[in-house]
Structure formats: C-alpha cells, structure tokens
C-alpha cells in the first residue's frame, strides 16, 4: 500500500497538463484528491472521468474566497488536509521587454503575477491552518525559468523567481509544522496559456514551441510528458520519503544545467 493512501491532497489547475497528470498520479497512489479549476468544462470532465475519486471545485486561484470554499469542502469530505500543491499558472510566450508595449507590459505584469505569485500566496494562506494541524506540506510548481533566462520573457521569469522566494519564506515561517518545497519542470506537452492582457489567453505553449525544438535543447534528448514530472511531487508529499526536505526546489530540467559548450550532451554517439 502506498504511504499516500488516504492522504488528502489539494491541487490547483487540475484540469489539464501537469495538473491533470498530478491528479491521475495521486489518485493512483490512493490519495483523496481535490482540485480548484477555473474552467467549468474541465471541472465537468474531471467529475465524469474520476467520479467519487475527485473533488473538483470551480474557482479562481486569484480569489481567496474560492480557496476558502474549496478548503471547507475538502475538510468536510476528508476531515483533514495533508498537502497543498500550488500548480495553476500562465506563461508569457517569451514576450520580450523591447517588443512589448509599455501599457501592455504593465497590465500583463499584474495579470501574470496575480496568477503565478498571488495565487500561490492566497492558496498558502487558505491551507495553512489545516496543514499546521496535520503537520503536512506545501509544494509549488516552478519552471526552468526559476533558474535560467530564456524559459519565458521577463514577466514569466520574474514570477518564477518570486515564487522561489515565497517558498523559502514560507518554509521558514511554517517550520517545524509544515514542509514547503518546489518542483521546477522544463518544457512539456501541456495546455499552458498566456495572459489575456498580452492577447495570449487562447494560445497554448505548444503553439509557440514544437516537441522537436524542446527535445533538441535538452541533454536527455526527449520531449517530456506531464506524467514524467509527477515523481518528485509524490516524494515531497510523502511523510515517509520526505521527513527532512523543506525550502528545497527540485530542478527537473532534463539536464539543462549540464549542457556543454561544444555539444548539448557528450554522449550523443554512445
């Protein structure tokens, strides 16, 4: 039996991409899974697909009242909350400083930071009392843009660097009761969209990047699927497998940090 059996896990943005892969994985691990999802259609799809195994709540991660409503339903259903996974986010499709109009830059900043940073902060606030009571954990989705330039434009990159600071501060404030960590995946097959302020709300990441382009820059030379990144979340959520890690950011970058100067990877001819 998995050590996550009957653990209560709350994931934001569980309707598609990495969020959906996390929902699938934690249900497989025997956890009681809940998600806060903006799209009514995705909420309906989750309920139809997973039935009683999912508590799918329609709501916006930029609204504290929606978080409170979700947490109340989780506590009514499970009687506890063991792990909060802040995952919902948006990308800026590499919108650059020079090519983005000033007024768009300002409105895009507020929209993107509201989702990627404030959304995490509000989720942490709403979940903290229950997680302190259960001595549970928080996990936040980062990105390779939390370590490197070029994983997005200045808006997205700044938001993910801000999230690393949030993780460290919350890990400090909530210790010893709550472990707070992050996972930073690289590019993957997902439906990640952009800010409406930048005209990107209907544009997914795969319309800007191709599988071949993503695989070519990674030393491990493959095109990741969302399920490829769920393992670190499972490990960090596990009380047995993660007793000692807090304030840690796992850089799940398929080897980006070891790219060579002469070649992407030295073993391409092996």
From Swiss-Prot:
Positions with a binding annotation for NAD(+): 10-34
CDD domains per UniProt: BphB-like_SDR_c
Highest taxon listed in the record's lineage: Bacteria
Catalytic activity: 3-(cis-5,6-dihydroxycyclohexa-1,3-dien-1-yl)propanoate + NAD(+) = 3-(2,3-dihydroxyphenyl)propanoate + NADH + H(+); (2E)-3-(cis-5,6-dihydroxycyclohexa-1,3-dien-1-yl)prop-2-enoate + NAD(+) = (2E)-3-(2,3-dihydroxyphenyl)prop-2-enoate + NADH + H(+)
Binding of substrate, residues: 143
InterPro entries: BphB-like_SDR, Dihydrodiol_DH_HcaB, NAD(P)-bd_dom_sf, Sc_DH/Rdtase_CS, SDR_fam
GO molecular function, one term: 2,3-dihydroxy-2,3-dihydro-phenylpropionate dehydrogenase activity
GO biological process, one term: 3-phenylpropionate catabolic process
Key words of the record: Aromatic hydrocarbons catabolism, NAD, Oxidoreductase
A UniProt-annotated Pfam family: adh_short
Enzyme Commission number(s): 1.3.1.87
Active site positions, chain numbering: 156
Pathway: Aromatic compound metabolism; 3-phenylpropanoate degradation
Family label: Belongs to the short-chain dehydrogenases/reductases (SDR) family.
Task performed by this protein: Converts 3-phenylpropionate-dihydrodiol (PP-dihydrodiol) and cinnamic acid-dihydrodiol (CI-dihydrodiol) into 3-(2,3-dihydroxylphenyl)propanoic acid (DHPP) and 2,3-dihydroxicinnamic acid (DHCI), respectively.
Identification of the protein by name: 3-phenylpropionate-dihydrodiol/cinnamic acid-dihydrodiol dehydrogenase
């Amino acid at each position: 039996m998995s050590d996550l059996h009957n653990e209560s896990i709350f994931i934001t943005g569980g309707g598609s991409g990495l969020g959906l892969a996390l929902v699938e994985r934690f249900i497989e691990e025997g956890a009681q899974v809940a998600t806060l999802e903006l799209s009514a259609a995705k909420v309906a799809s989750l309920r139809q697909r997973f039935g009683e195994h999912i508590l799918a709540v329609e709501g916006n991660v930029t609204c504290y009242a929606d978080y409170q409503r979700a947490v109340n339903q989780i506590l009514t259903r499970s009687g506890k909350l063991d792990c909060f996974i802040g995952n919902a986010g948006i990308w800026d499709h590499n919108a650059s400083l020079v090519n983005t109009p000033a007024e768009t830059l300002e409105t895009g900043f507020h929209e993107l930071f509201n989702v990627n940073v404030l959304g995490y902060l509000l989720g942490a606030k709403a979940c903290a009392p229950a997680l302190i009571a259960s001595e549970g954990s928080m996990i936040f989705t980062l990105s390779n843009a939390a370590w490197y330039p070029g994983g997005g434009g200045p808006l997205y990159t700044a938001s993910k660097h801000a999230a690393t600071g949030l993780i460290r501060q919350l890990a400090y404030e909530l210790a010893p009761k709550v472990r707070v960590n992050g996972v930073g995946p690289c590019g993957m097959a997902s439906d990640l969209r952009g800010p409406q302020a930048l005209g990107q709300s209907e544009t997914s990441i795969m319309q800007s990047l191709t599988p071949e382009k993503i695989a070519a820059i990674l030393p491990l030379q493959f095109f990741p699927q969302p399920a490829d990144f769920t393992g670190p979340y499972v490990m960090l959520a596990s009380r047995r497998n993660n007793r000692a890690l807090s304030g840690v950011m796992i850089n799940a970058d398929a080897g980006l940090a070891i790219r060579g100067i002469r070649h992407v990877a030295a073993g391409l001819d092996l």
